[in-house]
Amino acid sequence: MATIFYAEPELVIGHNRKILFVNPNDLQIFKEIELPTDLLSSCGLKSSSTSTAEQQSAAAETGGGSVVEGEEPKDTKTIEAGASASAPTVSVQNVSYSPDRQLLAVTTAGQKALVLYKCRPEHAQLVSVRALARASSAIRFAADSSSVLVTDKTGDCYQYDCIETEALPRLLLGHLSIVYDILWTGDQQHIITSDRDDKIRVTNYPATFDIHSYCLGHKEFVSGLALLSDEHICSVSGDKTLRVWNFKAGKELLRTDLPAPAVRLHHRQLPQKSDGDNADNLQRHQLGILFYDHVDAVGLYELEGNGDVWSVTVSQQIRADAGSWNICNFALTEERVYVMGAKDERLTFRCYNSSNGEPITSQLPEGWLTMILDQFPGDAGSCLPEDLSVWFKKRFDNVSDYLERKKRRIEEQQQQHKC
C-alpha cells in the first residue's frame, strides 16, 4: 500500500520497499530507507504466525486480553534463513513517526513485521524487527513514544514496547471487524478505535477490558479519526458524513454532510485567531479528506470549536483530475496538498494549492517528479491501488422470496377454505 504523510518538517513517502524523506519546499530527497528483500530471515526470524502466536498467547495472559482456544494460526509455512528465493515480497504497509520524532515505525505486508528505526538527521538506524501474525491495518505511538499500538485486519490491537524491544507484545483489545484507525490520547488514559462495523469505541487504558464509551451514529465504515482536544475527536465515514464527538460522553456534537464516502483523513492544527473575545478558548483545525470515486478527489475543511460547540467554517474541494488516474493517498501541508496515486498502474504524484485547489506547476523545481519516481525503477514503481469497494457492507435480501412464497401459500389456503 502506497503511503504519504507530512510530519513537520518532512514529507514521508512509502512504497514497495522504500521510504523517502523529502523536503516539502524544494522536494529534494535528503534521506531514504530500503527494506531488505528477505526482511524476517535476515533478522533470524520466521515468516509465519507460529512463533508470533505463541508470543501473543503468552502476552495475552498478562495483557488484559484473551486468545480463543483451539484457534489455528492463519499462516503455517515457515521460511528458514537463506531461503530468500521463496520468501514473500516485502512492501511498506503503514508508516508512523513517534511524537518526539526519534523513532519511525513501519509495518510491512508480504513478510508481515513491525520494523522500528531510530531516526538521525542523515540516516535511520534499525532498532528491531518483530514478526506479526496478521497484516496490520493501523499504527499509533504513545504520547511519550515509549510504545506503539498495532491493529490488524482481524480487529485485534497489540502494544509493542519501544524501549524493551525484546518484550512480548501485549494484546489490549479486539473488534469483530477490521480496525481502520486508532488514537491514543495525550494522557494515555484512552484508546479510541474505529472499525468497519460503524463503531467508534473508547477503551480505558491500561485496564483495556473496561470500555469507557461508544460514539455511535455512523451508518457505514468509520475510515478516519482525528484528536481535536482532550475531550473531542472528529470522524469521517463511508456514510458521507463528518462528525465531531465528545468521546468521553459518547455524544455527537456536529454532523456535516460530505459529497462522497470518505476513505482517508489527515488533520492539521491551525493557530488560534488573535482577535475576538473568545480567542483564547477557540480551537481551529484543518481536515483533509480523500473521497471515494468522486469528481472532487480531496476536500479541505476548517473546524472551529469552543467547548462543545463546533462548526465548519471553510471548505475547499480539490478535483485532482479525479477519474484520469487512481488516487490512493495524500499529504496535507500548510500551503500544499500532495496527492499520490497510480496512472497506468505506475506510481505518480501531483501537487495542488490548498487555498484554491488549483494545480501547482511554476513553484515546483524542474524535474522533481522524475527525481522521486527514479527511486522506484522497474517493478518497484508498479502501483495497484487497494479495492476500497470491499469496505462497504454487502447487503443480501434473503427474506423477500420467503415472504412471497408465504403470501402465495396463505392465499392458496384461503382459496381452499372457500371451496
UniProtKB/Swiss-Prot annotation:
UniProt keyword tRNA processing, yes or no: yes
One GO BP annotation of this record: oogenesis
Main location: nucleus
Gene3D superfamilies for this protein: YVTN repeat-like/Quinoprotein amine dehydrogenase
UniProt feature, compositional bias: Low complexity: 51-61
Any Pfam family matching the protein: WD40
Protein name in the entry: tRNA (guanine-N(7)-)-methyltransferase non-catalytic subunit wuho
UniProt keywords, alphabetically: Cytoplasm, Developmental protein, Differentiation, Nucleus, Oogenesis, Repeat, Spermatogenesis, tRNA processing, WD repeat
